[in-house]
Amino acid sequence: MLSALARPASAVLRRSFSTSAQNNAKVAVLGASGGIGQPLSLLLKNSPLVSRLTLYDIAHTPGVAADLSHIETKATVKGYLGPEQLPDCLKGCDVVVIPAGVPRKPGMTRDDLFNTNATIVATLTSACAQHCPEAMICVIANPVNSTIPITAEVFKKHGVYNPNKIFGVTTLDIVRANTFVAELKGLDPARVNVPVIGGHAGKTIIPLISQCTPKVDFPQDQLTALTGRIQEAGTEVVKAKAGAGSATLSMAYAGARFVFSLVDAMNGKEGVVECSFVKSQETECTYFSTPLLLGKKGIEKNLGIGKVSSFEEKMISDAIPELKASIKKGEDFVKTLK
């Protein structure tokens, strides 16, 4: 049922170029000058769903904004530079996307980014809590398994926490799963949908191939290899880029897909489903990614895990200890802040 509800991967990006969509979303990108931020900002500028695009970073944002502002689409673009300009960037925003932070290099795990990115995310989300407390917050900055608990605890500190509006963007895992399944089966990836649950790092990434639409079957050895490739796809890109960065273009695509789905739902479109790492009661983990029915106020309904195979069931139980540790690490970090 979950997979049937979820739209094919590219449908939402295609819609973002249609002229009938409401053009009213005010979107901020924090970390807009970086490897993900620039192509993400380009995709957002290209969409009629967005009426105002505000870009923030600690360097180069005026140039990125000037460059994007010449594109012949409706969204107005303005760049903001440095902490003193951050409040103005956020005022009146409906959606804030946070790709800010340092990328992975070869040999690094997403968790190795924690010390740097935890501080960046805490600082940026604190500003969001003060200047756009009602906005949808979409966190791309890794490690997502920790940066979402950080975001939640920061919002709690400011007394404006709403669990239905804070999202860890795991969409790239779904995009990769769709692509890799389509490659193996000779299908159009735009017509494949694989729910991916759990978290957004290594073995916490749990593709539910048994729930794939259309239904696909793999022998166990191929299924194990496919699952491993989906889990380590980010590392595949880091290695291929040989020290020159991590997944930026595919992450920008996935981030834009999630934002467009969210804005569609905020505009009243029904049946919009995306997986995301959010506050959850679906497992013993306090945060967990599952398919979510999105609505005007964020999460309308958590659609849960659904029926899974014994292979997937084992992956879920194996992921929980690591997820719990990452969640605790994020929550404990906020306790150390002034």
UniProtKB/Swiss-Prot annotation:
The modification Phosphoserine is found at residues 246, 326. The active site is at residue 200. Residues 1-24 form a transit peptide. InterPro entries: L-lactate/malate_DH (IPR001557), Lactate/malate_DH_C (IPR022383), Lactate/malate_DH_N (IPR001236), Lactate_DH/Glyco_Ohase_4_C (IPR015955), Malate_DH_AS (IPR001252), Malate_DH_type1 (IPR010097), NAD(P)-bd_dom_sf (IPR036291). Substrate binds at residues 104, 110, 142, 176. It is found in: Mitochondrion matrix. One of its GO terms (cellular component) is mitochondrial matrix. Its main location: mitochondrion. GO terms for biological process: aerobic respiration; malate metabolic process; NADH metabolic process; tricarboxylic acid cycle. It holds the Pfam family Ldh_1_N. Enzyme activity is enhanced by acetylation. Transmembrane segments: none annotated. Keywords: Acetylation, Glycoprotein, Mitochondrion, NAD, Oxidoreductase, Phosphoprotein, Transit peptide, Tricarboxylic acid cycle. It catalyses: (S)-malate + NAD(+) = oxaloacetate + NADH + H(+). SUPFAM superfamilies: LDH C-terminal domain-like, NAD(P)-binding Rossmann-fold domains. It is an enzyme of class 1 (oxidoreductase). NAD(+) binds at residues 31-37, 57, 117, 140-142, 251. The modification N6-succinyllysine is found at residues 78, 91, 185, 203, 215, 239, 269, 296, 301, 307, 314, 324, 328, 335. Homodimer. Belongs to the LDH/MDH superfamily. MDH type 1 family. This is Malate dehydrogenase, mitochondrial.
